């Protein structure tokens, strides 16, 4: 674990048996804790969403329904209970991608619950994701 930007990335004061990655000055826990838009804080928000009273039932017991399996560059699925549906959509391609949630045969009223880039483009039931973007809608 790269804890900070000190010698040996703050892991040890001794000699480590594995080399420390040269990026430890830029990528470390201390740096992540200093930025609200860091991966560390994103995972904190993700965990809080999963544990929230409003969504813990659907995230824990909801049926997993794959979505857009024919579309390259997208990994997406819905979690569904009788009363609730959340959509998890990620774009792992190098290009922006637009998907239409009406193809799910539902007409959801969507709200952004979590977005790793904080710039999701949601227009009715159409959503545009930039490269590397992940969003949870509910």
PLM regions and their residue ranges:
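C-terminal beta-strand-rich structural cap/linker in extracellular carbohydrate-active enzymes
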Residues: 121-138
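Intrinsic disorder/low-complexity detector
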Residues: 7, 93, 102, 117-121
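Beta-strand-rich binding/interaction modules
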Residues: 96-115
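Loop/helix patches that line or flank the sugar-binding groove of alpha-linked glycan CAZymes
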Residues: 1-97
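Solvent-exposed beta-strand/loop surfaces of large extracellular or lumenal domains
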Residues: 111-125
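A generic structural signal for short, non-catalytic loop/turn and secondary-structure boundary residues
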Residues: 70, 92, 103-106, 129-130
